[in-house]
Each structure stands twice: as C-alpha cells, then as structure tokens.
C-alpha cells in the first residue's frame, strides 16, 4: 500500500509539473504576441521615417536594376529610337519617373529622381554616331578607289580590244581580195606604219635638239652672268681706276685693213697678181675722227631739207639698195 501511494503521488506531481510547464509556455507565447501587437500597433515617427526611406532606396535600386537589364537586353532598333528621342529632346528637361510601387501611399512618398544613365547613354550614342560617320567616310573612299581602278582596267581592255579588232578587221578586209591586191594593201599599211615611226623619231630628235639648245643657252647665260658678276666686283674693288669711254667699233674697222696690208706685203708680187684687186677703199688711220666737229652755219634747218626732190629720191633709192644688200649678204652698210 505504501508503495502504491508513493507512485500515485509521484505521478500526480509529474502531471502538475507538465501542466505548469504548459501554462508557462502558453503565457510566454501570449505575452510575446501581445508585445508584438503592442509593438506593431504604434511605432515612433523616427522608426517610420527610416522604414520608408529603406523602402524608397530598395524601390530605386530595383528600378535601376530593371532599367539596366532592359537596356542591355534591348535590340539595335530600340537603341536607335532612344537616341533619336534624346537628340530631339535635348533642349527639354529630362522626364522624371516616379518609383512604380503597388500602393498609392508609397507612390506619394517616393521622391522624383532623374535618370542616372542618361549622360552615359548620350556619350555612348555620340561615340556610336562618330564611329558610324568614320566608317561611312572610309567606305566612300574605298568605293571611289575601286571605281577608278575598274575604269582604268576597262580603258586598258578597250585599247587591247581595239588593237586586236583592227588587226582582225584588216585580215577580214583582205580575205576577199586577190593575192596581188592583198600584197599591195599590206605594203601600203607597212609604208604608213613606217611613216608614222619616222614622224615619231623626228619628233623625238626635235625634242632632243630643243633640249640641247636650251642647255647651251642656259650655259651661255651662266657665262654671261659670271662675267657680269666679275665686272661688278672689279668696279666695286678699291683698285678700280675710272677711265674715259672708247668705242671698240671704230678700232675693229681700222685694225682689219692694216692686217690685210701686212699679209699682202709678206706674200709678195705673185700672190698679188694671183689675187684680184680689192674694190674696197683703204681707210687711213689719220682720217678716223677722234673728236666731235660742229657745223655752225647759223641756219635754222638742216641742209638736206633744201635738196631738190629728184636728188633726195635718188639718195633714198641708193640707201634702200644698200639696206637690201646688207640683209641678203650680211655685209655692213658703209
């Protein structure tokens, strides 16, 4: 009996402990629920503001990610449309997009912010347009070069085809003729080709002669220039002495007949008999004028004006004959 009573007491105690534990756990859970309700029922203003800011930042970060994904996944056409719309509305301010939240309260709370990727996208679009314009210019230059090369090739082909066509036409034209006429026609063609070759050679020789002549003229001018420079240097030097001017024309004329006289004296009478007598008049050195002589007749007009008409015409006729002889023979007029 004593053992049974002790067992029952222990069982009752364990049951009481279990009930007490259950009650304590339920009370703690109810207390936590009530505390959480109290806590969630009213919040201080600072906590609500920080919570709204966190939500705004999260919404903005989500918007940025979504825009980046859409811009990266968009096609070439959408990029082009976007660049056109930006270029049209450059002067206008950028449209402000609000955060697309589900509730209206959150939408009203969110602040408007401009696009963050607008400047970078504009720069990239400018770079693209520049690179495209450069590519277009390069393509145009390449196309022009290709066209010029094709034109040159076409001209060369035309020249070769014309030459071949000429030879073919000649052969075709000579086929229906008899052999004698064919030989004559071929001879004529050969003569024409030889004449053309002679003309080309003559033109070449003329060009070479002209080049030589120009070279000689350049050399002569160089010699004259050097002589002139030396004369100028001699005049400018300190050892230069001024002298009176003497004409070399009269001196040459006087020297020539004196040389002729010396030659005739040395050759003897045989050479004098063999040679015909000279028709020219011998000029004495005493007769050469050395000073200017003035004729003061106290007359207002020249004496040639008082000559008769027939005498003046005869003198003029003689002068014309002398000038004609000078032009034809090259001898100076006395």
UniProtKB/Swiss-Prot annotation:
Residue ranges of the region described as Disordered: 1-179, 198-220, 246-290
Biased composition (Basic residues): 14-24, 78-118
InterPro entries reported for this sequence: SRRP53
Localization annotation: Nucleus; Nucleus speckle; Cytoplasm
Coiled-coil intervals: 180-236
Post-translational modification: Phosphorylated.
Biological processes, Gene Ontology terms: alternative mRNA splicing, via spliceosome; nucleocytoplasmic transport; response to antibiotic; RNA splicing
Main location: nucleus
Chain intervals with Low complexity compositional bias: 265-278
Listed GO CC annotations: cytoplasm; nuclear speck; nucleus
Keyword annotations: Coiled coil, Cytoplasm, mRNA processing, mRNA splicing, Nucleus, Phosphoprotein
Residue ranges with Basic and acidic residues bias: 1-13, 44-62, 132-166, 198-218, 247-256
PANTHER family assigned: SERINE/ARGININE-RELATED PROTEIN 53 (PTHR31968), SERINE_ARGININE-RELATED PROTEIN 53 (PTHR31968:SF4)
Job description of the protein: Plays a role in pre-mRNA splicing. Involved in both constitutive and alternative pre-mRNA splicing. May have a role in the recognition of the 3' splice site during the second step of splicing.
UniProt subunit comment: Interacts (via Arg/Ser-rich domain) with LUC7L3, RBM39 and RSF1.
Protein's name according to its UniProt entry: Serine/Arginine-related protein 53
Organism, scientific name: Mus musculus (Mouse)
Lineage: Eukaryota, Metazoa, Chordata, Craniata, Vertebrata
